[in-house]
């Protein structure tokens, strides 16, 4: 069966935030998919809301790798940020010590959730030279300007600014995380470089000792590893504006390209009783704490039980339900041989793959797993094999010890 057929089955319709509708996914390079996802700012342990994009885009990468000869997955580490500086000072430890501790914990949480490592995991602090070069180019081309030790991007020089978020300039100024400052030519102009005081991290630059703005970090790293234009940029819904909007502006203007990424994919929020889970509201559960009560696979399954673009309401009841279903699935696959897992998409259950191909509809895909489990419990070995293979595509039912318990 042809590789072309596998690709057609992989992502038939994927929602693209840029155009606000589903589109057929075709990579820029026929045999190579390039994907960038925004990673953590390493000042604290991740909570379940932070874990959702990790799990969702892990499934996306697994699906892409099953369909295409080469996938390059880049997920960055933001290790220069004012939150990091403040947290290190609060704890009385060095910034480097805080970052290393947090990165170690992050990787530990990813492993517990069965989130595969990206092909490349660049750290912002290791790419300052590339950021300075990109900012210099933006100034030379007239898209950025220096003011009081800061370098700012002039959003009025970018006619398409606001296309991703669909916001007008007035809405942007009124929106969250737009800092009004007297040195800005326009209130919505955003920082590319800012000065650093002696006690916080800084690097020498043409504009004095300072540090990069948040947005330039991802633009420089994605271009360095994936090129000036690449296939998919992924992240949480809260990153659409200002982060991704600003990435697009500075990247397109720096490189003179029509786009930064062809597809923009964003996951919905994790909520608690209908309210967004966030550290600022204090209604969060860290992955570390959740793992004290449930194994990582249960958390992963619960996050996949809702469509990735819809809100997911996190609760103990949701986790208990996930555990019950997983136990049922493990009983059903106990007769299957793990050596016979199917990896060819064209041989997997058609309804399951069709569900994933339609904008990664994991709830519908999971309903297919329920059907296969019912058939497997009736003694249909082929269905048990399909259940194990399809679940593997979601990063589930991978614990051989749990399968053995149910034999």
Regions found by a protein language model. Give the residues of each.
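Structural preference for alpha-helix termini/caps and helix-kink/transition segments
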Residues: 276-278, 282-405
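Short, polar/flexible loop-turn hinges at active-site or ligand-entry regions and domain interfaces
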Residues: 91-97, 118, 309-313
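Alpha-helical recognition segments enriched in aromatics with Gly/Pro capping
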Residues: 5-8, 12-43, 58, 107-108, ...
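Short catalytic-loop micro-motif centered on adjacent basic/acidic residues
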Residues: 118-122, 233-235, 377
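N-terminal, positively charged nucleic-acid-binding surface of large information/translation enzymes
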Residues: 19-22, 28-114
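Conserved adenylation A10 loop of the ANL superfamily
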Residues: 47, 215, 406-407
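Short, glycine/charge-rich beta-strand/loop segments that flank catalytic centers
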Residues: 77-82, 103-106, 116-131, 149-158
């Amino acid at each position: 069966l042809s590789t072309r057929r596998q690709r057609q089955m992989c992502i038939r319709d994927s929602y693209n935030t840029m155009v606000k509708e589903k589109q057929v996914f075709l990579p820029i390079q026929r045999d190579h998919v390039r994907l960038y996802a925004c990673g953590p700012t390493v000042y604290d342990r991740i909570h379940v809301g932070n874990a959702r994009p990790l799990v969702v885009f892990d499934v996306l990468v697994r699906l892409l790798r099953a369909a295409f000869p080469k996938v390059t997955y880049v997920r960055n580490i933001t290790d220069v940020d004012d939150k990091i500086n403040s947290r290190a000072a609060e704890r009385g430890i060095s910034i480097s010590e805080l970052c290393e501790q947090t990165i170690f914990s992050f990787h530990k949480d990813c492993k517990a959730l069965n989130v595969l490592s990206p092909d490349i995991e660049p750290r912002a602090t290791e790419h300052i030279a590339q950021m300075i070069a990109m900012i210099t180019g933006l100034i030379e081309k007239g898209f950025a300007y220096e003011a009081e030790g800061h370098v700012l991007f002039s959003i009025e020089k970018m006619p398409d600014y606001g296309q991703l978020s669909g916001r007008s300039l007035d809405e942007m100024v009124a929106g969250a995380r737009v800092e009004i400052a007297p040195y800005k030519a326009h209130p919505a102009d955003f920082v590319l470089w800012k000065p650093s005081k002696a006690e916080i991290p800084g690097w020498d630059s043409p504009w004095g000792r300072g540090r990069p703005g948040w947005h330039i970090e991802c633009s420089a790293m994605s271009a360095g590893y994936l090129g000036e234009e690449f296939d998919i940029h992924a992240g949480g819904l809260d990153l659409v504006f200002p982060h991704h909007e600003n990435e697009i502006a500075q990247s397109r203007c720096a490189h003179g390209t029509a786009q930064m990424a062809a597809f923009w994919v964003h996951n919905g929020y994790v909520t608690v009783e209908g309210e967004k889970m966030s550290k600022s509201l204090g209604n969060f559960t860290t992955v570390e704490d959740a793992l004290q009560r449930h194994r990582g696979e249960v958390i992963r399954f619960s996050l996949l039980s809702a469509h990735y673009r819809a809100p997911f309401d996190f609760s103990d009841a949701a986790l208990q339900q996930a555990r019950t279903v997983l136990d049922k699935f493990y009983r059903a696959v106990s007769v299957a041989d793990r050596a016979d897992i199917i990896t060819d998409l064209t041989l997997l259950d058609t309804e399951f793959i069709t569900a994933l191909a339609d904008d990664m509809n994991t709830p519908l895909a999971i309903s297919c797993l329920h059907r296969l489990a019912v058939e497997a419990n009736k003694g249909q070995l082929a269905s048990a094999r399909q259940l194990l293979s399809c679940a593997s595509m979601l990063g589930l039912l991978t614990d051989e010890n749990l399968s053995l318990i149910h034999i």
